A protein has these predicted regions:
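A metal-dependent hydrolase metal-coordination microenvironment
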Residues: 1-116, 149, 156-167
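Short beta-strand/loop segments at the ligand-binding rim of alpha/beta enzyme cores
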Residues: 2-4, 121-131
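Extracellular glycoside hydrolase catalytic/binding regions
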Residues: 134
């Protein structure tokens, strides 16, 4: 028996670019034969759907809604659902895995971290940093920037975008 996981997905609750809410994403991926998914909505410095003028706790609660809905539905239908996020630095993006909502609530300083500081804080806390779609060419990406000393992995395949040129 094989395992199939989607490790980079956005929900309409957390990411401005997404069109489908978390619970529906869970159902769609279960129907497609997936074992599990990781919700990685766009974080503070990226294409987030959450109002940055909110107090930090309110922002985090709103940010986590897509994941929480997907997790509830995943538990109900037998799909593993994990939490992560995609941080953005001038169109250079990183997937963060292994941390949770409480960690975000306890670390508001993550909003202002540099790439280097993010890696240090995430790693010290037990998480990992993966460079998302490092070679994507798109109008919003002015330059391709690589940070080999500040990532634990690199996303090799990124597909499923509405515009195929970004796959």
């Amino acid at each position: 028996m094989g395992y199939l996981y989607e490790t980079h997905m956005h929900t309409s609750q957390g990411s401005a670019c997404a069109h489908v809410p978390g619970a529906e994403m869970a159902r769609l991926y279960k129907e497609a034969g997936y074992t599990g998914i990781v919700i990685t909505d766009h974080f503070w410095g990226g294409n987030t759907a959450i109002d940055r003028s909110l107090e930090w706790a309110d922002w985090v609660n709103g940010f986590c809604e897509g994941y929480e809905d997907a997790k509830r539905e995943g538990d109900r239908i037998g799909l593993q659902v994990f939490f992560g996020w995609e941080s953005g630095y001038n169109a250079t993006e990183f997937l963060i895995y292994g941390l949770d909502k409480q960690w975000l609530l306890d670390h508001p300083e993550i909003r202002d971290c540099t790439v280097e500081q993010q890696h240090e804080l995430v790693r010290r806390s037990g998480g990992i940093v993966v460079h998302a779609h490092p070679f994507r060419e798109a109008p919003y990406i002015l330059e391709i920037r690589l940070f080999p000393a500040f990532v634990d992995g690199v996303e090799g395949i990124n597909v499923g975008n509405r515009d195929p040129q970004w796959n």
